[in-house]
From Swiss-Prot:
Keywords: Nucleotide-binding, Phosphoprotein, Transcription, Transcription regulation. SUPFAM superfamilies: GlnB-like. One of its GO terms (molecular function) is ATP binding. Phosphorylation dependent on the nitrogen source and spectral light quality. The keyword Transcription regulation applies. InterPro entries: N-reg_PII, N-reg_PII-like_a/b, N-reg_PII/ATP_PRibTrfase_C, N-reg_PII_CS, N-reg_PII_urydylation_site. One of its GO terms (biological process) is regulation of nitrogen utilization. This is Nitrogen regulatory protein P-II. Pfam families: P-II (PF00543). The gene is glnB. The modification Phosphoserine is found at S49. It comes from Synechococcus elongatus (strain ATCC 33912 / PCC 7942 / FACHB-805).
Amino acid sequence: MKKIEAIIRPFKLDEVKIALVNAGIVGMTVSEVRGFGRQKGQTERYRGSEYTVEFLQKLKLEIVVEDAQVDTVIDKIVAAARTGEIGDGKIFVSPVDQTIRIRTGEKNADAI
């Protein structure tokens, strides 16, 4: 099993979710996060003063899948989240040793 973590632009969430559901993914966790990278900050105005927001709002998606689904999930996220501009995000893939559904005690693939 693998855990796929994707950092995406917030307005792309619906497109990514639809693409993943259509690919058979039945669950994911979404968290609001802030960060910076090549996109840098952006200048905003507040009460007549300009200031730079260095940490930009993003969403972090966490999805645990069987190894055979990893490439499909990555392809779906990239296709749905891409704008072609700096700041589209990143995808990280990590191994998952064990998964347990707390309610039933099911483990691994049965718990996904």
